[in-house]
Amino acid sequence: MRVGCDIIAISRIEKIHSRHGKNFLDKFLSPKEQILIKNPATLAGLWAAKEAASKALGVGICELCSFFDIEISKDERNAPKLKYSQKITKDFNITQTSLSISHDNGFAIAIVAIV
């Protein structure tokens, strides 16, 4: 099992988004993921989730793993789900993923576990 964690100030993501708008979103979220955004806390949670997912691989966001190799969605109970691209799943021999996202006191945090 490998674990990745990321925490970010919601105000930081909110500031970047207000400055760059959709261009910022397009750099790290697919159109399907952008639909999930309800408020700045949700957006910060998505950022933290992708960062945590890349850290669980032990590489971070880089040429080995881009933001678009990581897909965040919701299940039928509205819980976050994580899916890696086929290439990442194969290269890192991933069989299971687990994602938790939380927001509190101006911060968003995400934890990812992969097997």
Swiss-Prot record:
Its EC number is 2.7.8.7. Mg(2+) binds at residues 6, 51. Pfam families: ACPS. It catalyses: apo-[ACP] + CoA = holo-[ACP] + adenosine 3',5'-bisphosphate + H(+). One of its GO terms (cellular component) is cytoplasm. InterPro entries: 4-PPantetheinyl_Trfase_dom, 4-PPantetheinyl_Trfase_dom_sf, ACPS, Ppantetheine-prot_Trfase_dom. Keywords: Cytoplasm, Fatty acid biosynthesis, Fatty acid metabolism, Lipid biosynthesis, Lipid metabolism, Magnesium, Metal-binding, Transferase. The keyword Transferase applies. It is an enzyme of class 2 (transferase). GO terms for molecular function: holo-[acyl-carrier-protein] synthase activity; magnesium ion binding. Belongs to the P-Pant transferase superfamily. AcpS family. Transfers the 4'-phosphopantetheine moiety from coenzyme A to a Ser of acyl-carrier-protein. This is Holo-[acyl-carrier-protein] synthase. It comes from Campylobacter jejuni subsp. doylei (strain ATCC BAA-1458 / RM4099 / 269.97). The gene is acpS.
